[in-house]
Amino acid sequence: MTLKVNRRSAIIGLSATLATPAIAQVQLPAANQAAAARRNASSFVTQDWRDHFKTLGKGVIVADTFSRALHYWNADGSDYRVYPTSVPMTDELTKRGYTEIVRKKVGPTWTPTKAMRERDPALPDFMEAGAGNPLGSHAMYLSWPAYLIHGTHDTRKIGRRSSSGCIGLYNEKIAELFAITPIGTQVRVL
């Protein structure tokens, strides 16, 4: 018997071969599908405020340094937002745990810490608000001294390990978050 292969047969055979991985992927057990869904299309890990806080209080923020995202929920939980962030350059610069927003400032000034100046002696002693200021357009100060959630004029930093300990957002995103976040908002840094 002779096997005759025409173009249609070859295309059908190739299509079936290429589709097999997709079919196998759809047939994952439910437990594996749920685990795979924990990351969204932007690769941020999905967070639930209940995993971190007993109540929403005035609102809550989860700053996830691993997936480089900030999650915000308002006081009644009806407003949930997620923002891409910059995170500390090293784990040694990262403070993790619970804190809260204690002060907010539009057009923050910047004074490098002693540790920053030791790492880079060329840093200025003080910097007024403006385009060269690394704190960007808005800053929300945490109860931990020298730790902030702030903007940045250098958009290349977002999504990267680039800060000296703070959580940075695009200026337009920190302005949005600043407007809806009251002093007293609970914060957890992971």
Give the residues covered by each predicted segment.
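Short N-terminal micro-motifs specific to bacterial/archaeal maturation
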Residues: 1-2, 61, 165
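Sec/Tat signal peptide C-region and signal peptidase I cleavage site
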Residues: 22-24
